Every structure is written in structure tokens, then in C-alpha cells.
Amino acid sequence: ATAAARIRRLNEQAEIVVFERSGYISYANCGLPYYIGDVITDPEELTLQTPESFFSRFRIMMKVLHEVTAIHHDRKTVSVRNLKTGEEFEEGYDKLILSPGAKPTQPKLSGMEANKLFTLRTVEDTFKIKAYINNNHPKSAVIAGGGFIGLELAENLRELGMDVTIVQSQKQLMMPFDSDMAAFIHAEVRKHGIHLVLGHKVEGFIEKDGGVNVLLSDGTSLPGDIAVLAIGVTPDTHLAKEAGLELGVRGSIVVNDRMETSVPDIYAAGDAVQVKHFV
């Protein structure tokens, strides 16, 4: 959406079409846990723009619930599936921008198909967790991952009265912070009644006694009514790979200083691309 808006500002005449496989085009990820915790009660407050408002402002066609399934750079088209109707069609392009973003990291662990195991990345994920809580009233949760989303979710589940445990493979939360600063975070989190299990790696999940047990590398397990996997994200680049684009670190899309990929007239931006770190 950001790239599309910028193109419109540079070119008032260009025909711009955006395909988005989810039902939402612009939302604040860090606000999602606060909808689960009832701090945000109106779901419309999660979104910054709608397809209608975006078209009204920028004259850009935003086709939500449309998934691009293939790129044909030899004839400069993409294959698209309408997720509501099942219709499939091809759309031509002069220039193509890939911005698939990132998906929750899903390690190859046993029990990943457990019904009470969730991830939190999209608005749809948020509604799924919220609906489960409203319908089943879980009393406890285990969150795997101690980054921003994991901590915000822990805060909100605790506010709902749930017993919350965070398990982290490293020996501190918030790895970008120095250990002495992380110590203050640990103290604050524990002060609010959240349990920390640090330096323990998750090895799998098993549904048991109406809940889910999170299996740890030391042979122990953490029981919860639900579990949430929040261990980071991975570039979502399967389309680029299938189209033959050059990939780099962790499967990210390689681009030059102009954000051009290895294929002419295809650009890429966002969480899916490889960038230079100048520090």
C-alpha cells in the first residue's frame, strides 16, 4: 500500500492494482494484542485504511482476498485466485512490485497442528484467538517467544485474568536490549504475575487434558489451555522462489539499490527483501 501510494504521487495517470490475499490492507501489528485484551474494542480501529478509503484518496484499486499464485515474467503476467469465489485469472503488468512481507516462523516441531496452538501476525489471527477465548474461556496460556508481540500478548492475556507463562530459548527477553536493561523488564513482567521460563528451547506440542502441553528441551513441559507461537517471522518468498528470482539470506529477495530484483521490471520491498545493515 505504501509503495502504491508513492507511485500515485509520482504518476497521476498510471493504472495501479494491488492484490492482497488477506481481507485487510493496512493495520498496526502492535495493536493486535490490545484487541485480544479488550483495550481496543472496535475492530475497525485496528485498520488504518480500507480498500474503499484508499481508492477514494489515491484512485488505486485494492483487491483484497485475491492471492497471486504465480509470476510469469516471460509474458509479464501474474496468476491470481479470488479467494471468495475461487475464480482464477491472469493480470498483465508493465512493472511488478512484490511486497509479500513475512510470515510467522513455524519450526518443524511435533504437534504444530494442535488446535489450541496459535500464531499472531495478522488481523485474521487476532480474530481467531479472540473468538477462541470468548467461546472457551481458557484460564492459562503459554507464549513461546519474548519479543515485542509476545510481551504485548502476555500483558493482555494477563489483563483478562489468565495465568501466563513466557518461554524463551535465550536467557533474556527482548534480545535487542542489553542484559542489564532486560533485567528491569524481567522484574516488571514478574511483578505483574507473569511466569518466565528462560533459556529453555521448545521441542514440540501435545494436546492433553483439554489443553496443550509445551514440550521443552530439558524433558519437562508447560501445560496451558492455549499456546501461542511468537518466535519471530520469516520472509514469505515462495512466489519469488518459484519465479526464479535470486534469493539471499534466510530466503529473502535480493535487490539492488533501486529495489530491483534479478528479473527485469520486477521490484521488491518490505519485510521480504534482503537489506544492507549499515551499523
Model-derived features: positions:
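Beta1-alpha1 glycine-rich phosphate/pyrophosphate-binding loop at the start
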Residues: 1-65, 154-177
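FAD-site-proximal beta/loop scaffold in flavoenzymes
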Residues: 113-137, 213, 220-279
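A Rossmann-like FAD-binding core segment of flavoenzymes
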Residues: 13-15, 57, 63-84, 91, ...
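Rossmann-like NAD(P)H-binding beta-loop-alpha module
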Residues: 124, 128-177, 211
